[in-house]
Amino acid sequence: MDIREIEQERASFAFKVVSDIKDKYSQNKKVQGKYSSYAEKAPTIILNNGLGATLAFFLSKLEKPIDDVDYKSINPESFGNAENIAYAFLYKHLSTWLAEGNGKDSAFSGLTNGEDPLKYIMEKTAIDVAISTEEALSILNWIKKFAKAMLEEEL
């Protein structure tokens, strides 16, 4: 696996998820701005508090409780305000990358074998958590870049 391939996969995934936000919320600049702002701040939160605490923080920002910690079952569009929608999308995007990468046939197919990353890191060794944290920071670097370039700034 070539590092350039992995970087290309990260860039491709980040471009896709940010483009989806831009398309779905073309009339809602507040969601775009919140997503961009939270993506910008997420790496610092991870470095200060850890990946697990950051993922739990994102979930705590949702306006209604979720039945289970499972990124696949979270529907960001079901949350009412821009802040909740943005946090839900960021959790879902980060979790999807860590769990699945860009798919089974890609250069990077995830770290957690499809398991929700928050559950995964609570059960794994410090080395597994460190690897997951590095990957989270790497994908967020791309998400930040595309969000800053493509989305409206927070009002």
From Swiss-Prot:
Xref: InterPro entries: AF1862-like_dom_sf (IPR023101), CRISPR-assoc_prot_Cmr5 (IPR010160)
Highest taxon above the source species: Archaea
Signal peptide: none
GO cellular component, one term: cytoplasm
Pfam family, any one: Cas_Cmr5
Protein's cellular compartments: Cytoplasm
Keywords: Antiviral defense, Cytoplasm
One GO biological process term: defense response to virus
Keyword check for Cytoplasm: yes
Family: Belongs to the CRISPR system Cmr5 family.
Functional summary from the UniProt entry: CRISPR (clustered regularly interspaced short palindromic repeat), is an adaptive immune system that provides protection against mobile genetic elements (viruses, transposable elements and conjugative plasmids). CRISPR clusters contain sequences complementary to antecedent mobile elements and target invading nucleic acids. CRISPR clusters are transcribed and processed into CRISPR RNA (crRNA). Part of the Cmr ribonucleoprotein complex.
Annotated NCBIfam families: cas_Cmr5 (TIGR01881)
Protein's UniProt name: CRISPR system Cmr subunit Cmr5
Upper classification of the organism: Archaea, Methanobacteriati, Methanobacteriota, Archaeoglobi, Archaeoglobales
